[in-house]
Design a protein with these regions (language model features):
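Residue-level recognition of well-ordered beta-strand positions that form the cores
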Residues: 42-44, 108-110, 140-142, 162
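Compact mixed alphabeta submodule
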Residues: 118-192
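Acidic, gly/ser/pro-rich intrinsically disordered tails
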Residues: 1-7, 168-219
């Protein structure tokens, strides 16, 4: 086989360059509700980016078909895709009070292993303050089926990130704990917690010190 030939994975998606990163906990894994520490990011995709949306919908469908046996479990039939949890969510419906999510869909992605992070020229980004909630870039993500204690759905795994440009640092009203508590493997229930995303707090402090002051990125 030619080593240069890429094997197409229908469950893998590279988002468009205008995808915005929110709750970017990508430098250190974080444990949520006592679970396995993971890296995570909320990917905000404009509804006008129909190409990326279509690719994600197709990948979710592929993950559903590939995971039918897992989704069926001990049941008599495979549940319909329309009745299980899926990761592509409507920002206008779920985040009506957050301008960053207006006219956009979003996908929460996470991983146990650290994502590779590069710049627009594909050089590794080593300075943590360069990546924060609010930047724009591509994300390499993969979709897969899960069935945990009867909680069934399609989840999104985070592979790699490519920062394209800076953006206005984002604030956040919902916590990362709330967003990711039940999305990855169906364990636990989402709860609205008052504390902020620790990765964003660290980044805010780091950037504040680097600039000699300034406002934190999250209220």
């Amino acid at each position: 086989m030619n080593k240069n030939v890429k094997i197409n994975n229908p469950m893998k998606v590279i988002t468009g360059p205008n995808t915005r990163w929110s709750y970017a906990n990508v430098w250190e894994p974080k444990s949520i509700n006592g679970g396995t520490p993971k890296y995570s990011v909320s990917l905000i995709i404009s509804k006008s980016d129909t190409k990326t949306i279509a690719k994600i919908e197709a990948a979710i469908e592929a993950a559903y078909k590939e995971g039918e046996a897992k989704l069926k479990g001990n049941g008599k039939s495979v549940p319909a895709l329309s009745v299980i949890k899926t990761p592509l969510r409507d920002g206008d419906m779920e985040r009506p009070d957050d301008p960053a999510y207006a006219n956009a869909y979003f996908v929460n992605a996470n991983a146990i292993s650290a994502p590779g992070i590069v710049d627009a020229d594909r050089n590794p980004i080593l300075t943590r303050s360069e990546v924060y909630s609010g930047v724009y870039g591509r994300a390499s993500i993969s979709f897969y089926a899960f069935n945990s204690s009867g909680n069934k759905g399609i989840a999104c795994g985070l592979n790699n990130l490519q920062k394209i440009r800076d953006g206005e640092p984002l604030g956040g009203k919902a916590s990362a704990e709330s967003d990711f508590a039940s999305d990855e493997d169906g364990t636990g229930k989402s709860q609205s917690l008052p504390r902020l995303h620790q990765g964003c707090r660290w980044e805010s402090h780091h950037r504040s010190r680097a600039s000699g002051g300034g406002k934190a990125h999250l209220p």
